Amino acid sequence: VDHRLKDNDKIVLEGNHILYAIETPGHSLGEISYIFEDAFFIGDSIPVKGDIPIYVDKNKILESLDKIKSTKNEIQYFYPAWDKTYTTENIEKVIKDAEEIVNEIDQAAIIALKENNDVEVTLKRICQILNKPMLEKHPLFIKTVYAHILSEKN
């Protein structure tokens, strides 16, 4: 690594094209996304309905969703790492769905923590509330749940 990128850093490419680095933490703490002309390469920044929500910081993922949403007037295409390409027309709906996922887990965490303060019991109860018992042992989903538990305890 010659240079560690930070928010709004510019990389000048051949032909004077500019690639912008945009910090979008949440899925991982140091996540960087990239804007190139009218395209935003957003990596794993948006939890997607029907997939396992994976992020390590609840507040940061929500901030990153807001940051992505704020670009919708300048960006035509949003390219996630795994899901289909989003457009200006559907990005708000995709982000709204992602916010609902985060809020649903958050509400489950609040309920579970009121019932019991033990982390293991709380994890199991959150999975029950979400009707996703199969995720109880999933190591990456456990990190997502811990992000909510830590947020509620702080």
Predicted regions located by residue number:
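Accessory terminal helices/loops
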Residues: 70-76, 84-154
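Active-site HxH/HxHxD metal-binding segment of metal-dependent hydrolases
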Residues: 1-14
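Generic low-polarity alpha-helical segments
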Residues: 4, 36, 53-54, 123, ...
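Short, flexible active-site loop motifs that bind/organize anionic cofactors or intermediates
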Residues: 14, 51, 112
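Metallo-beta-lactamase
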Residues: 18-106
